[in-house]
A protein has these predicted regions:
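Glycine-rich flavin
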Residues: 43-53, 57-157, 171-173
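Generic structural signal for well-ordered, non-transmembrane alpha-helical segments
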Residues: 24, 257, 293-300, 332, ...
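C-terminal helix-coil-helix/basic helical segment that borders enzyme active sites and/or dimer interfaces
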Residues: 31, 35-38, 301-337, 350-358
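Glycine-rich phosphate/cofactor-binding loops in nucleotide/flavin-utilizing enzymes
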Residues: 355-403
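Basic/polar N-terminal segments that are highly enriched at the extreme N-terminus
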Residues: 1-21, 25, 402-403
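DPxDG-like acidic metal-binding loop motif
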Residues: 146-185, 189-190
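Glycine-rich beta->alpha junctions and the first turn(s) of the following alpha-helix
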Residues: 194-195, 201-299
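Short segments within alpha-helical structural elements
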Residues: 344-351, 382-386
Length: 403
């Protein structure tokens, strides 16, 4: 395959260490703009510009399109570092970057249409559930639907939308992922939320639009072996790792960074505080030390846990292996349990802020809101994600068309 003629910035020479350094360098800048993102209910232009200039939307985009094509552990690490500055920024980058990796499943024609003129082009999504409905027409499908939680849609020229294809009798005959240009969908300004406001995760809709076959990829019934045309174009085993089993790890990265920010801010606050009556240093209280220690241990444990999942999966695919059902369910279990521990850590730290933490201008208040809002994501539901792994461990059988 010939490399496309890339006119925007080319980040193919940026390695893992440099990419992580770029993300780390943005932390102070992101903290300065976090409140602005929160109020705008989307990333402000200055933040989007900085991310583009540093190539941080493109850390797992193929090198042939000017992306960094980093190892899969970056799937967690880059959002984690950005999340230390602002959870919403880390979350949006995690989502939009993951769609760069996902586009590699589509045929070359689709990749050329989206990235041919501008590899910086971003793709948002409505894929958590197949909320669209489609019928077969000549050359493609006719798609109608309404998809919620499309993070970063304000900055994206395309949408990746999931749908169920039905026959004339209404019977499901396929499940497809569709790449849809901005001109064919409508964004509803409905993102008024408790937290994660800066993600701008709005609802998108479309009515009876035509999606050609080359942009409507079969994910299940018509493609039981999950043999995707785009994988023939990209040799890196990272692109073969199934998103369904590790999809939550990138956004969990952002929220691990958010919890780390809570730890850092609380630690700095404790070093400076003393009691009003006795002047005793807050840092000398053993109860305070215990809380800091417990929160830090939980955050470090989750970081190690989820990074190890990413490393393990990539190492397996490097040698031509594939994930077992047990491994896929274990990764999903780890992601959900990890978020539970992160919420506990942030709660512990927020309690230490006392009355000062309840003000709108308190970074800890936003961090607290963001952590709890993010925990509502289906990937982090312990009820949904822990029991399937246990079911298999106990000798049961777990079936899912999308896993």
């Amino acid at each position: 395959m010939n490399a496309p003629d890339i006119k925007p910035l080319d980040f193919s020479s940026v390695d893992y260490d440099e990419a992580l350094d770029r993300a780390r360098a943005l932390i102070p800048f992101l903290r300065q703009h976090a409140d602005a993102n929160d109020k705008a209910t989307k990333l402000v232009p200055e933040v989007v510009r900085a991310l583009h200039e540093n190539g941080l939307f493109r850390y797992i985009q193929p090198k042939i399109w000017g992306g960094m094509e980093l190892d899969f552990v970056s799937y967690f690490d880059i959002p984690e570092m950005l999340g230390r500055g602002d959870a919403a920024t880390g979350w949006v980058v995690a989502n939009l970057a993951s769609h760069h990796r996902g586009l590699c499943l589509w045929p070359l024609k689709t990749q050329e249409e989206i990235w041919g003129n501008d590899p910086d082009t971003l793709i948002a999504s409505g894929i958590a559930y197949a909320q669209g409905s489609a019928t077969l027409v000549e050359g493609g499908i006719e798609l109608t639907g309404k998809w919620g939680f499309s993070s970063g849609v304000d900055h994206s020229e395309w949408e990746q939308l999931a749908c169920v294809v039905k026959d004339a009798e209404g019977k499901p005959i396929d499940w497809r992922m569709c790449q849809v240009p901005q001109s064919q969908f409508t964004v509803i300004n409905d993102w008024q939320t408790l937290g994660m406001r800066g993600t701008g995760s709005r609802t998108v809709t479309c009515q009876k639009i035509f999606v050609p076959d080359y942009r409507a990829l079969s994910m299940h019934i018509a493609n039981p072996k999950h043999e995707f045309p785009g994988l023939k174009l990209h040799s890196n085993s990272m692109f073969k790792i199934p998103t369904a089993s590790l999809g939550g790890h990138c956004i969990a990265g952002a929220m691990t960074g958010n919890a780390q920010a809570a730890l850092e801010l609380t630690t700095e606050m404790v070093k400076l505080r003393s009691t009003n009556y006795t002047g005793a240093k807050m840092r000398d209280f053993q109860t305070v030390q215990l809380r800091i220690g417990m929160a830090g241990a939980k955050i470090d444990a989750v970081r190690t846990w989820l990074r190890n999942d990413c490393l393990e999966a990539h190492n397996l695919y490097r040698i031509g292996g594939k994930l077992t059902i047990e491994a896929k369910l274990r990764y999903k279990r780890n992601c959900a349990m990890g978020m539970k521990l992160l919420v506990e850590a942030v709660d512990t730290l927020f309690e230490m802020s006392g009355a000062m933490g309840i003000y709108d201008n308190s970074p800890l208040q936003r961090i607290y809101r963001d952590q709890h809002a993010a925990a509502g994501h289906f990937s982090f539901s312990t009820d949904a994600q822990l029991t399937p792994w246990a079911q298999v461990q106990l000798g049961g059988e777990f079936k899912s068309p999308t896993l």
